[in-house]
């Protein structure tokens, strides 16, 4: 028997896939949106940009922008009861529209 690999994108076949109508380049408004520290964002991984994508466990998580590092944003989010820091670009962020 051969041991199966458990790579960085393991078990993400459906999660990191675009629907046929979403294929192609993302809209410019998503990329040009400026986030300020304190803004709430949703981590929505865009599978087109692999190098700056956060781990799949953060897909759909709501976080708060803490600051920037170059072109990337530093996001503070919770994973269970632990506070985590995610560093990613605006390609994988969407402004939070929900309640509190």
UniProtKB/Swiss-Prot annotation:
- Using the UniProt annotation, give all residue ranges assigned to the region (Disordered): 1-22
Q: Does the keyword Ribonucleoprotein apply?
A: yes
One GO cellular component this record assigns the protein to is: ribonucleoprotein complex
Which top-level group of life is the source organism from? Answer: Archaea
Q: Keyword annotations for this protein?
A: Ribonucleoprotein, Ribosomal protein
Q: Which GO annotations describe the biological process of this protein?
A: translation
Biased composition range(s): Basic residues: 1-21
Q: Does the keyword Ribosomal protein apply?
A: yes
Which GO molecular function terms does the record list?
Answer: structural constituent of ribosome
What does the sequence similarity comment in the record state about its family?
Belongs to the eukaryotic ribosomal protein eL21 family.
Name of the featured protein: Large ribosomal subunit protein eL21
Species of provenance = Pyrobaculum neutrophilum (strain DSM 2338 / JCM 9278 / NBRC 100436 / V24Sta)
- Whichever gene encodes this chain, its name is rpl21e
């Amino acid at each position: 028997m051969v041991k199966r690999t458990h790579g960085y994108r393991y078990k993400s076949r459906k999660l990191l896939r675009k629907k046929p109508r979403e294929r192609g380049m993302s809209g410019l408004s998503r990329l040009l949106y400026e986030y300020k520290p304190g803004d709430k964002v949703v981590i929505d991984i865009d599978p087109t940009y692999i190098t700056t994508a956060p781990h799949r466990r953060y897909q759909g998580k709501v976080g708060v922008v803490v600051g920037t590092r170059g072109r990337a944003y530093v996001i503070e989010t919770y994973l269970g009861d632990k506070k985590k820091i995610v560093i990613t670009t605006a390609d994988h962020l969407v402004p939070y529209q929900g309640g509190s």
